[in-house]
Amino acid sequence: DKCPKGWLDFRGNCYGYFRYELPWKRAEAWCRSIRAGAHLASIHTSEEHRAIAKFISQYHHGEEEEDVWIGLFRWNSVWAWIDGSKKHYSALDDDDYPKGKHCAVLDESSGFLSWDNDSCGERNAFICKCTA
């Protein structure tokens, strides 16, 4: 299979960017509904991260700040990927986290090159990932 039209094709995976703003769980459900095996994106290398940041940045022209959900969430004080993949790479500032902010976003103010944690009920744009 090829990637759906308008999605990024990068090293055997497809990435779809959606600007509808949804809470994290609804964004994950949306990804799953689009294609079998799709989830909010997991990011495992700096190359993958840069490719995603560049892809999302094409849609941004200095408009209002719009952080983007990825598939990273905090469960029992451990960060994990919703697709079950192992966490090999992080762009989170691992210092200390305000309570109640258990889901991760690509931070728009960094050009999507750093991650931040946000309240999972906040509404953000999101990026889905599936295998090509």
Swiss-Prot record:
Which GO MF terms does the UniProt record name?
carbohydrate binding
Q: Where in the cell is it found?
A: Secreted, Extracellular space, Extracellular matrix
SMART domains xrefs = CLECT (SM00034)
CDD domains according to UniProt = CLECT_REG-1_like (cd03594)
Q: Metal-binding as a keyword? A: no
Disulfide pairs here are: 3-14, 31-128, 103-120
GO cellular component, as recorded: extracellular region
Pfam families, per the entry: Lectin_C
Q: Which superkingdom, per the lineage?
A: Eukaryota
Assigned keywords, A-Z: Disulfide bond, Extracellular matrix, Lectin, Secreted
Please list the residue ranges annotated as the C-type lectin domain.
Answer: 10-129
Query: What is the protein name for this chain?
Result: Struthiocalcin-1
Its source organism is Struthio camelus
